[in-house]
């Protein structure tokens, strides 16, 4: 690996370095993380919860008060039930209501068997091992491999982008408020930028979760597609500061995303199907 590996999110051996740390949580968000830990513990006892993680801009140290959201991953000992989902939604709502520093809370639920399965090894397993910061319980990263920026990782992380298109189109058609359009814009834009990055990740030989950097890495490998490059840069901008403009949603969902999904399948193939 070249001397720039550290600047590309890699360890010295070329594996992807885990991003984020509780020590990097900005002071303004420390009470939010502490409350999340306490409320998760209160909502899920030791017979249900195996471990909990925080991910995104807060543990990376780049969160902006009033703009950034709180992202959590809760790993249960068995597959989540309806009661577990309800408990997670209550934790989300309580944290969002009590802390103005955050603009929304999202808690993903899964199980230990799912995270450590062969099927999820290069998707959810990678996500936990490299993009999530331990908050509670045993860190499952110890049961997972070290990951490299390979075509296999690219395929399994975002090789199903095409499946998101019908859902985004339906949400765009049904959106009745600016808040709904902004929520869709942020989610779709982030997924598009991350897919644009992982499309070229094996060539770049590194990892980043920074949206602006991801768009520029994509641009490096698609100089003959200036329109797509500018659309990807737009996606990076609205991924951080979402727009309610229907024209922006149309550009992302009806133009850039279908092209990117087709390009992804051509380069890396289809993600292994899930049951």
Identify the residue ranges that each predicted region occupies.
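Conserved nucleotidyltransferase catalytic core and NTase-mimicking acidic/glycine-rich helix/loop elements
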Residues: 2-9, 140-275
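Catalytic metal-binding acidic patch
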Residues: 54-88, 106-109
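Short, solvent-exposed polar/charged micro-motifs at secondary-structure junctions
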Residues: 61-64, 115-120, 240
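Short, well-structured alpha-helical interface segments that form or flank functional binding sites
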Residues: 67, 123, 187, 191
């Amino acid at each position: 690996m070249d001397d720039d590996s550290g600047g590309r999110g890699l360890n010295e051996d070329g594996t992807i370095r885990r991003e984020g740390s509780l020590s990097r949580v900005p002071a303004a968000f420390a009470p939010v993380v502490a409350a999340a830990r306490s409320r998760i513990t209160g909502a899920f006892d030791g017979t249900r919860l195996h471990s909990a993680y925080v991910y995104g801009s807060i543990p990376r140290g780049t969160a902006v008060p009033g703009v950034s959201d709180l992202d959590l991953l809760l790993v249960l000992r068995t597959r989540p039930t309806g009661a577990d989902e309800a408990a997670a939604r209550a934790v989300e709502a309580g944290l969002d209501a009590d802390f103005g520093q955050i603009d929304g809370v999202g808690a993903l639920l899964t199980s230990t068997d799912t995270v450590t399965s062969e099927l999820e090894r290069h998707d959810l397993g990678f996500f936990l091992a490299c993009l999530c910061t331990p908050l509670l319980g045993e860190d499952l990263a110890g049961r997972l491999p070290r990951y490299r920026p390979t075509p296999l990782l690219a395929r399994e992380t975002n090789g199903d982008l095409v499946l998101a298109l019908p859902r985004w189109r339906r949400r765009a058609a049904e959106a009745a408020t600016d808040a709904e359009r902004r929520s869709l814009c942020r989610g779709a834009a982030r997924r598009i930028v991350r897919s644009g990055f992982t499309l070229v990740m094996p060539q770049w030989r590194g990892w980043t979760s920074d949206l602006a950097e991801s768009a520029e890495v994509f641009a490096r490998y698609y100089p003959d597609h200036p329109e797509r490059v500018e659309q990807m840069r737009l996606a990076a901008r609205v991924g951080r500061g979402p727009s309610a403009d229907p024209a922006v949603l149309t550009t992302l969902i009806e133009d850039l995303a279908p092209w990117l999904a087709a390009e992804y399948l051509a380069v890396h193939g289809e993600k292994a199907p899930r049951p």
